Every structure is written in structure tokens, then in C-alpha cells.
Amino acid sequence: MKIAVYGKGGIGKSTTSCNISVALARRGQKVLQIGCDPKHDSTFTLTGFLIPTIIDTLQSKDYHYEDIWPEDVIHKGYGGVDCVEAGGPPAGAGCGGYVVGETVKLLKELNAFYEYDIILFDVLGDVVCGGFAAPLNYADYCVIITDNGFDALFAANRITASIREKARTHPLRLAGLVGNRTSRRDLINKYVEACPMPVIEVLPIIEDIRVSRVKGKTLFEMVGFEPSLNYVCNYYLGIADQILSQPEGIVPKEIPDRELFSLLSDLYLNPIGGGGQKKNNKENLLGFTRI
């Protein structure tokens, strides 16, 4: 099974992806996580360091695939999760989609692409072009990470459009949304009411999740010396269980941009009728920052 994880930049995709990967491994799956971001920090909390990228390795070998061994590009992370970082083209040049394609090509050359029960693609930011959407060409399911803010849901809606487009030619389905770092879900509920899709899980604001990223550890590793965090791991184990159940998934129909803006703005301007929130919370409601 191949899963592509998308969401607004900075929403917590990599931290969530790493914890889901470990949760899947805890359920007995052989897991490979592929980071698809030029920052090549997707697997940082699994390995504790920035591993060499596929592109760096290919360049060092002058793109001679026959000179590359699996251990050159596949690194062992916490919990037995294997890790790969695709890397990216130089800033302002090249295409991220090409890099993803080269990564998959190399893994196939190494007979590694089909050796895993689960391959999880952790993909940068919003989908703004076909290059960023390239991992969807290989995925069975897409999982969208969001929060209860306007910007994150707007990005989720754009990703939804890409899923629908790719599903025309690939057996791709949306597994659902995962809410991250949110104490409320009124905007999420409003969105899925207008654009029906499953909500896999909603994680509350938990400071230890952010701290784990800085420490370069997954929550599962931190539980070893902080047993009180076990309840956080249960969120990720629940997500893993839903993925392993091979949900039917859906091909979603995105909401037109102006309609989505109007939908969420109505909740913002009419908080009592739209969700019962006080007007003095409006910055957080829309995900904007007061300057």
C-alpha cells in the first residue's frame, strides 16, 4: 500500500507522517517513508539527523545507477522504519516532480520499491503544479493534514482537486482528513459538510508533539522516558489501524474557491449561527495572525 500525505506548509505533515510510520511498523508492517521536500527533513524525527538525499547521491555517482547500493540511500530509522529523502532541484530551477520520479526509478532499480508493505510519501506544502502532485501517481490513498484554520482548509481543498484529477487515470482515493494542533473543529466540520469526506482523526494542541520535532524523536521514542505520553501515541495507532483497514476511500469534489471563501467567511461573520464562537477569537478562527 502506498500513501501520500499532503497539507499546508508548516501544518505538521512530517511530524505526523513519522509517527504514523512508526505506528504502522508497530502493527507489524514493513514501512518506508519517502520525504519529498528540498529541505530533506521529513525523516528527521525517525533518524535524528538529516540523511543524504537521492539527488545528492545520484550526483555524486554521476547518475550511474549501477554504482548505487540500497544502503547508500535507504537509512534505518526508529522502530525499524526505513527512510529515504528525495531532496529537490536547486532553488529557482528544476522540478520537484522530476526528483520524485528519479527517486522511484532508483528504488525500482534497487528492487526496493516493491519490498515494503507500506510506502508513505511525505510531500511538501500545497499542490500548485503537476510536479508537486507527482507522488499521487504512485499512491493508493491520500491523507490530508489540516487544522481548524482557513488557510489549511483552503490548501486541503486545492489538494482535493488534485486527487480528483489524478483519480481519472490512477486508482487513487482520499482516505480522509487528519486534523492537527486544533482545539476546535467547527471549520473542519463546516468544510466536510459542504465537501463530504472522512475525518480520520483530530489531534488536539499537544505541546509535546512540537517538542518531539525539535528533539528529533517520535512520540513513540519519547514514551520510553515519559510514559505519560502514551495517550498521544494512541492517536497515531488509531490512524494506522484505519489505514490498514483499507478503507473504501472517496474521489472528492472540491469546492470552488469563491464558494469556499464565502462558506468559511459566513461562519466568521456570524459566529453564533455558524459555530457559536465569540467574535474576539476571529483571528484564530480563520487561521490569520494579527499584525
Swiss-Prot record:
<keyword id="KW-0934">Plastid</keyword>
<dbReference type="GO" id="GO:0005524">
    <property type="term" value="F:ATP binding"/>
</dbReference>
<feature type="binding site">
    <location>
        <position position="95"/>
    </location>
    <ligand>
        <name>[4Fe-4S] cluster</name>
    </ligand>
</feature>
<feature type="binding site">
    <location>
        <position position="129"/>
    </location>
    <ligand>
        <name>[4Fe-4S] cluster</name>
    </ligand>
</feature>
<keyword id="KW-0560">Oxidoreductase</keyword>
<feature type="binding site">
    <location>
        <begin position="180"/>
        <end position="181"/>
    </location>
    <ligand>
        <name>ATP</name>
    </ligand>
</feature>
<dbReference type="InterPro" id="IPR027417">
    <property type="entry name" value="P-loop_NTPase"/>
</dbReference>
<dbReference type="InterPro" id="IPR005971">
    <property type="entry name" value="Protochlorophyllide_ATP-bd"/>
</dbReference>
<comment type="pathway">
    <text>Porphyrin-containing compound metabolism; chlorophyll biosynthesis (light-independent).</text>
</comment>
<feature type="binding site">
    <location>
        <position position="14"/>
    </location>
    <ligand>
        <name>Mg(2+)</name>
    </ligand>
</feature>
<keyword id="KW-0411">Iron-sulfur</keyword>
<dbReference type="GO" id="GO:0051539">
    <property type="term" value="F:4 iron, 4 sulfur cluster binding"/>
</dbReference>
<keyword id="KW-0602">Photosynthesis</keyword>
<feature type="binding site">
    <location>
        <begin position="10"/>
        <end position="15"/>
    </location>
    <ligand>
        <name>ATP</name>
    </ligand>
</feature>
<dbReference type="GO" id="GO:0009507">
    <property type="term" value="C:chloroplast"/>
</dbReference>
<keyword id="KW-0004">4Fe-4S</keyword>
<keyword id="KW-0408">Iron</keyword>
<keyword id="KW-0149">Chlorophyll biosynthesis</keyword>
<dbReference type="Pfam" id="PF00142">
    <property type="entry name" value="Fer4_NifH"/>
</dbReference>
<protein>
    <recommendedName>
        <fullName>Light-independent protochlorophyllide reductase iron-sulfur ATP-binding protein</fullName>
        <ecNumber>1.3.7.7</ecNumber>
    </recommendedName>
</protein>
<feature type="binding site">
    <location>
        <position position="39"/>
    </location>
    <ligand>
        <name>ATP</name>
    </ligand>
</feature>
<dbReference type="InterPro" id="IPR000392">
    <property type="entry name" value="NifH/frxC"/>
</dbReference>
<comment type="subunit">
    <text>Homodimer. Protochlorophyllide reductase is composed of three subunits; ChlL, ChlN and ChlB.</text>
</comment>
<comment type="similarity">
    <text>Belongs to the NifH/BchL/ChlL family.</text>
</comment>
<dbReference type="GO" id="GO:0016636">
    <property type="term" value="F:oxidoreductase activity, acting on the CH-CH group of donors, iron-sulfur protein as acceptor"/>
</dbReference>
<dbReference type="GO" id="GO:0016730">
    <property type="term" value="F:oxidoreductase activity, acting on iron-sulfur proteins as donors"/>
</dbReference>
<keyword id="KW-0460">Magnesium</keyword>
<dbReference type="GO" id="GO:0036068">
    <property type="term" value="P:light-independent chlorophyll biosynthetic process"/>
</dbReference>
<keyword id="KW-0479">Metal-binding</keyword>
<dbReference type="GO" id="GO:0019685">
    <property type="term" value="P:photosynthesis, dark reaction"/>
</dbReference>
<dbReference type="InterPro" id="IPR030655">
    <property type="entry name" value="NifH/chlL_CS"/>
</dbReference>
<keyword id="KW-0150">Chloroplast</keyword>
<dbReference type="GO" id="GO:0046872">
    <property type="term" value="F:metal ion binding"/>
</dbReference>
<keyword id="KW-0067">ATP-binding</keyword>
<keyword id="KW-0547">Nucleotide-binding</keyword>
<comment type="function">
    <text>Component of the dark-operative protochlorophyllide reductase (DPOR) that uses Mg-ATP and reduced ferredoxin to reduce ring D of protochlorophyllide (Pchlide) to form chlorophyllide a (Chlide). This reaction is light-independent. The L component serves as a unique electron donor to the NB-component of the complex, and binds Mg-ATP.</text>
</comment>
